[in-house]
Amino acid sequence: MRWRITDAKDYLQAKDYIDTAVIPLINIRVNNHFKMAAEKGEFTQLLSEELERQLKGRVYLLPPYTYVDRNEITVQGLKDLREELITEFPHVVLLTSDESWRAEDALGKMIVTSSVPLEHLNDSLKRKILDERTAEILNVLLQLWSTL
């Protein structure tokens, strides 16, 4: 399920089964890191969309949370968002390809995955890479869900 009205209606009818909100974190860097930020952002988006596709009915994919710098203001904004979501979703998972988040533990479940430059790969290789990464994330989510 995604952040759109048709899925919101479906969620309200099936909310007992949809216990996980997924928020992609995407860095917006336009100075020296424009291409790298776009690459990591695209990878995070594709990965989160694939995760939602495979777990439709269990996860709710929210719009990406975009930021310029990982700083106190960004962290506080994410804490506020998490507090809002935790009232509806027992699990709030942040997904990113930005390695600077790896040490962050104040925001709950954070999945940091290294991005892969996809621009020169053929479609079948892209699919294979996304499937492999999605499988890794599924294992993390299964462990998270089994702790309840």
Curated annotation (Swiss-Prot):
Task: Note the InterPro entries from the entry.
Answer: DUF2487
Taxonomic superkingdom: Bacteria
Name of protein:
Uncharacterized protein YpiF
State the species of origin. Bacillus subtilis (strain 168)
